[in-house]
Structures are given as C-alpha cells and as structure tokens.
Amino acid sequence: MTRSAPAWFAAARERISRGEAPVCVLGCGYVGLTLALECARAGSAVTGIETDEVRAKDLRAGANPVPDVLIPDGELAQLRDGGRLTFMTALDAPADVYVICVNTPLRDGSPDLRFVESAGESVARVLTEGAVVVLESTTYPGTTEELLRPILEEGTGLVAGRDFALAHSPERIDPGNRDWTMRNTPKVVGGLTPESTELVSAFYSRVCDNVVGVTSPRAAEITKLFENTYREVNIALANEMAITCHDFDIDPWEVLRAAATKPFGFTPFRPGPGVGGHCIPVDPQYLAWRVRGKVGRQFRLLETASDINQRMPSYVVQRAAEILNHEGKALRGANILLLGVSYKGGSGDVRESPALRVADRLVASGASVSFHDPHVPTASINGVVYDSQALDDAVLAGSDVVIVLTDHPDVDYARVLDRAPCVYDTRGVMERFDGSAPNLHRF
C-alpha cells in the first residue's frame, strides 16, 4: 500500500519552490551567513539568528563580521533595506523553513552539541505544522533523528515526518574559495521521509545547481564525515611519506610532483605542519567517537591518521632545532619568524591552526618567536597576544630562521628567501625557486 503525502505537503512545496516561504537561518558564521545571503539573493525573505550580540549588531548595520564570506560592498545593507534579510539575536516568530548552522566543536575529545540543542529548542518554541527543519551542522550519524527530533517533537507535540519535514544536509562551504561556491557545489540532502527529502531538495534547488538526495539523515551525516576522514587520512599519508623522504635524504616535493603525473589511481595530497580549521581536526573525531560508543570498536585507520597529523607540529619544532644546530645555534634563545599563523592560505582563520601549536612549542622551548601574517593582525601564543610584524628587511635579516607555516598567496617568497639567513619551508611554497639555495630547508 502506497503511503500518501501529508495534507500540507503540496502547499508547502509550492511556497518553497516559488520562493514565498520565509526562511530562518540559525547561526550566522561562515556557513549560515553564506546560506542566508544566497537565499535572500534568490528572492526569499530571510531572518538570520545570531546570538553573538557584537556580530549581530554588525550584520544589522550592514557590516560583514565574517571575513571568509565574500560579500560585495553594500550588499548586506541593500538586502536589509529591501526587506529580504533581517538579523536578530533570538528567534521569536515562525518561519516556513528553519536551517540550523551552528558550531559543533569538540569538548575533551567528545562531541559538544549544546549549540544544536539550544537551536532546536528555539525552533520548537515557534514550530508549526507544515514547516521544514534542516540541520546543516556537521555531526555524528544519528544526531538529527536521536537528538534534534525529540527536542522538536517534545517541544511542540508535533511528529516529524507527519506534521513537519526534517532532514540533514551537510554544509560544504570552503571559506574564501571563489571557484567552488554554494551555487556550483553539489548539495547532499537526507530526509526523515521521502517527502522531507523532496521539500528540502526543492528549498536548496533555489540556491544550488545540483541537489543529491540520499535515503536518510544518517546517510547525509556520515557522508560529510567520510569526506573529511578521506582528507585527514590522505594528508596523514602525505605527512608520513614526507618524513620518510627526509629520512632517506629525498626531496618529498619532487616525489609528489612525479607521483602526480600518473593520470589514474593517484590523487595528490600535500604534506604540512598539521591540520587545522573547522573541519579536518574535528569532524573525523565525531566518527571515531560514534564508532567507539555505538559499535564498541576503534576506527583504527582514522585514529592513526589523526595521531600522525597531531604530531606534526612537534615534528616541525624538532626539524627547526636540527636546522639551527646545523647552523651552530640552539633553539633556546633563537629568533624565529613564523610566516603565517592561519590554518590555510588566503584566510585569517586560526581555529585549530597547526601554526599556533608550532608557535606554542617553540616558545615553551625557549625560542624568541614573532610572526607575520597578512590576514591575522594579532594571535595568542602561549597565552600572550602577539602582533603581526611587518615583513621588512630588518625583520627577515634578524631572524635565525624563518619557518613558512601557511601558504598565503600574497607573500613575496623570493624576497624572503633572498633576505633571510635561513628558511624552513613546511608548505612547499619555495618549489618554484632554485632548490639548491644554501639557506633553504625543505619539509
């Protein structure tokens, strides 16, 4: 017997498809703000909920407080004045579509879902029949059905799937990437019911060119974890191979370039000082935690890869000490300039940045540390706030070693190599220069 769609389904689908459904985005960081903007640009009336009062004030004033979200000057104010984009610190009115885009950090190695719970409770206070609720926050498989669903149902007396649509759609935003945007990056959607998947797919089809449906929220949740576990494992392999190449006195960057010429069966990943940011150091740990707790076993490959990547900052410090010793200097008391402290090139995001872990270890070892980063004006190192230094000749010449930790595109690396007495390149940015330069040490 074929199950019929809920009575409200057709009308909800029509409103969503025509852009007439009011949208509420909970959490206006780089994920939520990007989604809110795209929905408003597509003609929807959008309310962004941001509990950080300073950030919310900036957004209401038309200022962009999230540097990694690329917004043309004046657009926030234009959308606000046109009635399509409003920002508030609390949810106090119903919408047709609610999208939860809050942070899901780790706390003592375990998932911290307090922000998801709080957002769910906010939605439950105003949720009505026929609405759509989507969780975009990255989390372990089962969160949408086992954590969010009970909060919504118990707070309303409604039943997910019967009275409102519920789905998970993992965010795939790459901060600062101008080539792969929300519009051209495929969007995975997994609904609690086929109707939920259809409604949420209709919603995202207004802002995404390709929506990919899967059969459940759990499938969508683990898809995101698989993507980032794949990256962590392969980065760990590249790091372990780079260490091995150094042990054998082989240039790892030459090996990587040569291996990448194979047109099939090989995808190049670059070694570096570790992994950082909002995804790679965190998301795979959600999967490992869930496997241990739900199945009672280890995800051994993932946990080994994570261990390798977490040890890379210590390896960088060890290599820096060896390089200084080769120059007749000790790590303790050495003047070390760190080139870049954000976790990725072109970004000012320092969350989980391996560069800061390198800095902490250097300071703890007695080195005198400074840094230059064109995207990070200040950074906390071992509890002390440091200012980014100008990359002038005196700073370069006065350093015992310059350690390249972030591959920012807007740095004159040729000048760095020419002025600094010693350069340790952990990112391969000096590949295009003469590898025989006596002051250059490769990762």
Describe the function of each predicted region.
Residues 2-443:
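Structural/interface elements that position substrates and couple domains in central-metabolism enzymes
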